[in-house]
Amino acid sequence: MERAELAARLIAADDAERVALLRSHGALADAALAYLLKDICLEAWASDPARATGAASALELFAHLDSDGEVAACAAWSAGIASLIAGQMERAVTHLDDAEARFLKLDLAHTAAATQVSKLIALALVGRYDEAIECGLGALKVLEAHGDILAAGKIEHNIGNIYWRRDRYDEAEHFFRAARARFQVLDDDRQLAMLDNCLAYIQSLKHNFRSAEQLYDQALERAERIGATVTQAEIESSMGNLALFQGRYDRALDYLERARRKYAEMGMPHESAISELEIADAYLELNLGSEAAEFYERVSPTFAELSMRAEQALALAHHGRAAILLGQTDKAQRLLTEARHLYAAEGNALGEAMVTLTMAQLHHSSGNYPATMLAAEEAEAPLAAAGVWRHLLMARWLRGEAARALGSAADARSVLDATLHDAEAQAQPQVAQRCHTSLGLLAAMEGDAKSAEASFKRAIELIETLRAPLPAEEFRASFFSDKLVPYDEMVRLCLADEETDRAAEALGFVERARSRALVDILGGALKVLPEPRDEFEAELLNQLEELREQLNWFYSQINRPSQKSDAAESADEMAALQQEVREREHKMMEITRQLQHRGEQPALSPEVEVLDIAQLQSELGEDAALVEYTSLDGELLAFVVTDEGVDVIRHLGSEREVEAELEQLRFQIDTLRFGAERMRKHLPHLTKRALHHLQTLYDVLLAPIEEFIGDERRLVIVPHRALHYVPFHALHDGIDYVIERREVSYAPSAVVLRHCLSRSPRPLNHALLVGVPDEQTPRVRDEVVALAPLFPEATTLLDEQGTLAAVREYAPQADVLHLACHGQFRPDNPLFSALRLSNNWLTVRDAYELDLQRCELVALSACETGMSAVAPGNELIGLARGFFSAGAPSLLMSLWTVDDEATAELMKDFYQRLCAGASAASALRHAQLRLMQEQPHPFFWSPFVLFGR
């Protein structure tokens, strides 16, 4: 047996087998074998960490069995490498010091110096920078004296890394280039790949983006060619950071996720933690504050445990930014103070300046503009000295925006103009769009409408360009959430124009900021559920399915009556179950987000889908009017679109007052939620109370627009924020309910409505009718049985037949999908709003997965199925979104808990008219009017609303 074969077998063996191998091959068990195992450990470190640690373990055992000094020294060296891989930096330093001492004792000064290459990494990661540089320079002299070009280059590379960590970029570049020259002489692809990654990062920090990208591409090609997996991950991580820096969020998420997966697969804890820190930074850029905060909370203790102070400080500082985004002022202050102390202990003035910049953001979010200016100005000098343009530009924008808010127009313009110029020169669109928005506000404040409009339009163009490539609807919606100001201001400018009627243009800007992520899905620009591209993603999908099964069990436990006789025990049991549910839902969301990091979505044109007013008017025809609500400064206004034109009705009332009135109405409706029969004798009085609130809402929301819509037109309502919960069809004018005079339907936006209208109607030949009764809905079975004969063909799934698998199987053939089962709206986690099937729950994400391209109508005859959370940009998050995304053009859903018996009667009447040829809106209106005669309280007849066509 050759030594190489013995080494390979020792690495793969367990300890007992290793002892046997060493004893049976004693002639080969010498210092040469120890050096061979040490070399394997060093070589495998960057490509196969498991093999490297295997070599270290074999050497450790070998040293116990052999008293040779060189064997022990090699074992200590390899133990240091294994500790580095495990993230145990202080232990790595101890082992490498031991190795150096043993080699020096053997009078092997050159080999002793070579051990310091690895020691520099450990010293730097625990913040012992001066010691590391002194150690490195000392070792460099010895290595140069012995002509060891490779080890000397590694030392220079690591010294460069130390200067980089201290944000001293010129010194870092000097050592990187010196090391690169040595590696080029040796034509060492492995070292060149690692070195070019570092050099590229320095170039990106200096805003030499083209040079950085060329170096990254070159480094990644080398690393892939030689199979250096760790180096590949490091380069992909760096490329992700560059993309994030440039606002190319799709590439950033994709590269960062690739790196995280590689580190996780190789079991490298400190690299995995750094990778998660970088993904959290990407989330923060996309306004996913809660998600970013969770990552920061997870990795900060890891960095503390590993004594990685620089990374811990960065995590704390960015966690502070997330807290600002979440409105947690005190928490942000505490986190930033802690980060500042760590940076001070590191002697990192630039890190302290970053914290000061974040403090300026905290003051700005609190409206303390004088403090904003002071903090931003304090941060500028060290940021400028380091050439950190992105953060410097953010500090300057904050100073300019604070000056604008304080009314210092001249100072604000000077700062903002200069900042915009530099942001464009440095390719920083994130800062540029902020500057354009601020300059637009400044121009508007000064009465210069033309300049304001130009600035706002440029800001909108940049926002939509940045948003276009994002790979998932959640990322697009969250990114948009704090960028609505220029859209609102363009609406304001259009409406203020006294020379030209720009109502249609104003509506166009409202639409560009409304339900855009849903529009992207309907327009085919987003895949909601991409296919797995590798085994890793396939395993993630398996985890999702396992979590789904666990959740179904917990949901069933929560929804069944408690077996505990003691109320306190029952409450504790319920709290424990709900905690289990929250943990699993959270994990599902995290895995789903991880799957969506991929950068393979079709590119979305920055030219967003614009509302074609003329086409909308043509589709509405003579008998329909679209009423779209929005608000400016908390005051509601409405756009009315008919075939005759576009009108704007302003000063309808304050959003706050409408929300208060709506809350009172919900209280009245909920009075009957838990049993109408026992309240029957009070129904006339309760009806009168409900009417009072319905009339008040009518007076605010519809009375002022009646003259613009005429007496005969049916209404399509596009609500705004809380108005999504208003039953417009049940509003009362003092004589009649609105539904008594006209048909009413709803849409998330005018563009979404146009997508629904673009579907050619199909005959309703085949219905899929699903009925899963429970204690709250005992009439469901009767409801479904009564509906089946109304259709030429019907697939009926009752009781235990009503499974999610069966719905998925039969839905693609259905013209109508009717789901009669218990529904649950989850305001705490709206994506987990669900319908209870026989064996599990159909959530929003399950609805996404259904194939409803043939389906004309989805009807959900259950409680609160039409409720949605309304995210910024009027993004509806609930069951409606799921079914729209799956392809349904029309949805029949409820706004509140429904009465089982009343629902059964209404559905039968509705479908009789629908199957006889009536439109869905007409059929629903007549069914509601008929039920109104028998059950006058709106609780019974008005919960159902029609979304879409």
PLM regions and their residue ranges:
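Catalytic-core domains of enzymes
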Residues: 41, 644-647, 655-668, 718-816
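Tandem amphipathic alpha-helical repeat scaffolds
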Residues: 3, 34-47, 73-88, 111-128, ...
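Eukaryotic all-alpha helical interaction scaffolds
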Residues: 62-64, 83, 103-104, 143-144, ...
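Short coil/turn linkers that connect adjacent helices within long alpha-helical scaffolds
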Residues: 27-28, 64-68, 85, 104-110, ...
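Amphipathic alpha-helical protein-protein interaction segments
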Residues: 449-736, 761-768, 789
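Catalytic cores of nucleophile-dependent amide-cleaving enzymes
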Residues: 748-753, 758-760, 765, 773-778, ...
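An often Trp-containing, charged/polar helix-loop segment at the C-terminal end
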Residues: 897, 902-949
